[in-house]
Amino acid sequence: MSIKSDKWIRRMAAEYDMISPFEPDLVRQVNGEKVISFGTSSYGYDIRCADEFKVFTNINSTMVDPKNFDEKCFVDVKGEYCIIPPNSFALARTVEYFRIPRNVLTVCLGKSTYARCGIVVNVTPFEPEWEGYVTLEFSNTTPLPAKIYANEGVAQVLFFESDEVCEVSYRDRGGKYMGQVGVTLPRS
């Protein structure tokens, strides 16, 4: 299993629509304004956060239970940025829609720009033949409010191609997050 380069990422995006919309270069400015970079890098793809967020709140005094998740735990926010309360978190989704080939697995890591501000980005691997918008989790580990910018880079996806094709893919087993759109909450 080896990590894939910018050349491979560009080819897969063009030939297989693996990432849509796709940015073939690393973008650092938009309309003359600095942004947190996104697009194709040397050995990965920097994904963007869309403008829809679900911010964790305790106003309804509910319990967090991954097997029986209550949507009242979140407040919906839409905009150019999202403010995450101290020691809290928010969910969002990517701008990009992914279609992962059967012989590929991805690992996603948060960008250092956010990590250096105490903001942790968590994303699980994209499994073989999974497709959809990626649900992102932002944890604000600081005692201060934290800002997340929509339509700018938040994490980097690394692509690993296997030497052999898996016997059962995410699609084959009917994975519960297949084809997800919008910000997707836990499913049991």
Curated annotation (Swiss-Prot):
Pathway entry: Pyrimidine metabolism; dUMP biosynthesis; dUMP from dCTP (dUTP route): step 1/2
One Gene Ontology term of the molecular function aspect: nucleotide binding
E.C. numbers: 3.5.4.13
One biological process term in Gene Ontology: nucleobase-containing small molecule interconversion
Active site positions, chain numbering: E137
Coiled-coil zones: none
Residues annotated to bind dCTP: K111, S112, T113, Y114, A115, R116, T135, L136, E137, Q156, Y170, Q180
Assigned keywords, A-Z: Hydrolase, Nucleotide metabolism, Nucleotide-binding
Enzymatic reactions: dCTP + H2O + H(+) = dUTP + NH4(+)
InterPro entries linked: dCTP_deaminase, dUTPase-like_sf, dUTPase_trimeric
Hydrolase listed as a keyword: yes
Signal as UniProt keyword: no
Recorded family membership: Belongs to the dCTP deaminase family.
Subunit structure: Homotrimer.
Function: Catalyzes the deamination of dCTP to dUTP.
Protein name in UniProt: dCTP deaminase
Organism (species): Laribacter hongkongensis (strain HLHK9)
The gene coding this protein: dcd
